[in-house]
Amino acid sequence: MKKLFGTDGVRGVANVYPMTTEMAMQIGRAAAYLFKNGNRRHRIVIGKDTRLSGYMLENALVAGICSMGVDVLVVGPLPTPGIANITSSMRADAGVVISASHNAFQDNGIKFFSRDGFKLPDEMELKIEELIFSKKIDSLRPIATEVGKAYRIDDAVGRYVVFLKNTFPKELDLTGMKIVLDCANGAAYKVAPAVLEELGAEVIPYGIKPNGTNINAGFGSLHPEVISEAVKEHRADLGIALDGDADRVIFVDEFGNEVDGDHIMAICATDMLKHKKLRKNTLVATVMSNMGLDIAVKKAGGKVIKTAVGDRYVVEEMLKGGYNLGGEQSGHMIFLDHNTTGDGMLSALQVLAIMRRSGKTLSELAEVMIPLPQVLVNVRVTEKKDIMTIPEVAALIRGVEDKLKDEGRILIRYSGTEPLLRIMLEGQDKYQITGWAKEIADLVEKKIGGK
């Protein structure tokens, strides 16, 4: 059982355990020790988003890693997928991301990429914890002449911009397109506008003035209403919203209607099927994806495989099965032909390329999928116990499942990063499933709720 690492690295409130400088330094030391392999000089890339606490955690990690005789390449604020990309392109031994993704600025997190740009497997995270909690790491100290150095990589943003532009078809550009772009005052505030402008688009930017405390605050992929209003106001072709570390993207079409991750997957999967580019004709999604996605992909001659929630599990399934497209309803898209992890801007470019090639608007493309009505209710809990061990709750859930039959589904799971139980229902009748979801949520709240 892991004590520090959750579904997406170590996460918590900045300057409160485990997100302290002391723990960050220990994590850096343990990771550096594990990534060393042989007698050569080793290098680890460190990047971050725009949170104020990024400075303190970055310096603690640099100190910890250097103290183990490993050099550090500091890239500064850069999208999470950009850090993965730079890690593999610079042939570093690992990459570290300091970010809490879409969470508020008070939180921060630390996660790792292996040398090939993929997230670490659970076993490696357990080894890092074991070294820290057994105190073994305390006695491992290279002599003074063997400690590491830290270097700043000044052109990391430029390198990533070039990489992204190279994923867009050479024969196409974005001339004449008006795009509203929301960078959530996060890590993509320089990269994303540059990519779209260099490809010829007229960009109307929002959320590009980070101050350390405004990341995700009223902007970004969790607030599509910002780009929705802006698209209508500016009569733009579409809106693109990234989250704080730019590993996910949400769109709105030319009418200001939201186009979520399921629709993006449907658009990309059906286009790739048409051009015979979808490996094994299979899309990998999670159990949170709408049944409408399965129907759309099946109709186009493909199939959908479902995994647990979390882009790391999507990637694991993709690598295991040899698939090249996967994603989540929340907007994480993984195009393994191009990158190793969820990449908001890369996904946006793939959708823009389909729009350009087909001559269709985003609303026309989004018609490929008709979602079943879906309701999601979150309940704050005091403990994460197996919900089916509470007899009244289990009986209510089974009763609802019987009523839904094959016309819908119910999915109940705990958040990997917060004390929340997520209750999701899908069915033909929105009012009916809303009532059932509320009924289950109220009962859970009564039993294990925490205000």
From Swiss-Prot:
GO terms for cellular component: cytosol. The keyword Ribosomal protein does not apply. CDD domains: GlmM (cd05802). It catalyses: alpha-D-glucosamine 1-phosphate = D-glucosamine 6-phosphate. It comes from the Bacteria. The modification Phosphoserine is found at S101. Mg(2+) binds at S101, D243, D245, D247. Activated by phosphorylation. It is an enzyme of class 5 (isomerase). Its EC number is 5.4.2.10. Catalyzes the conversion of glucosamine-6-phosphate to glucosamine-1-phosphate. Belongs to the phosphohexose mutase family. This is Phosphoglucosamine mutase. It comes from Geobacter metallireducens (strain ATCC 53774 / DSM 7210 / GS-15).
